């Protein structure tokens, strides 16, 4: 498949893309079922993910494909790709290289846990930084 020629496969049409041509994606660690991160994909990103078996997302801020780990080396090897019952969310079951998925140097982007009550609560970091981000992104 050559995704450069815009000849994308028909199976992509089953996905319910939003008005911007994007679909939300959850990356889950295949071995532990830990939820690692949330991101977005466009058609090209999903096709490249299937083709290469490595996670490729779409960066809304940079407006381009984001090959997970292209700067940090923390790539995600994709074991399985699933589509939810409404066909509007993609789940990637991945092997997270180095164990770090988050740009903060943590295993998961979901490292903040709410503790307390609605009137007296706050978000608390409950996962350690595994590697200082200044040493990840040089």
Swiss-Prot record:
Name of the top EC class for this enzyme: hydrolase
Disulphide linkage map: none
Cofactor: Mg(2+); Zn(2+)
Pathway: Amino-acid biosynthesis; L-histidine biosynthesis; L-histidine from 5-phospho-alpha-D-ribose 1-diphosphate: step 3/9
E.C. no: 3.5.4.19
Keyword field contains Hydrolase: yes
Compartments where found: Cytoplasm
Predominant location category: cytoplasm
Keywords (A to Z) from UniProt: Amino-acid biosynthesis, Cytoplasm, Histidine biosynthesis, Hydrolase, Magnesium, Metal-binding, Zinc
Residue positions binding Mg(2+): 84, 86, 88
Cofactor binding notes: Binds 1 Mg(2+) ion per subunit.
Known function: Catalyzes the hydrolysis of the adenine ring of phosphoribosyl-AMP.
Protein name (database record): Phosphoribosyl-AMP cyclohydrolase
Gene (name only): hisI
């Amino acid at each position: 498949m050559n995704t450069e020629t815009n000849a994308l496969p028909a199976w992509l049409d089953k996905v319910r893309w939003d008005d911007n041509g994007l679909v939300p994606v959850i990356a889950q660690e295949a071995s532990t079922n830990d939820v690692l991160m949330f991101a977005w994909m466009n058609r090209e990103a999903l096709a490249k993910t299937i083709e290469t078996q490595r996670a490729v997302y779409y960066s809304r801020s940079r407006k381009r494909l984001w090959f997970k780990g292209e700067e940090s080396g923390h790539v995600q090897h994709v074991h399985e790709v699933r589509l939810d019952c409404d066909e509007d969310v993609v789940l990637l079951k991945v092997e997270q290289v180095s164990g770090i998925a988050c740009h903060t140097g943590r295993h998961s982007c979901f490292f903040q846990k709410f503790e307390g009550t609605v009137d007296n609560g706050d978000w608390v970091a409950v996962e350690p930084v595994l590697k200082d981000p200044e040493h990840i992104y040089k």
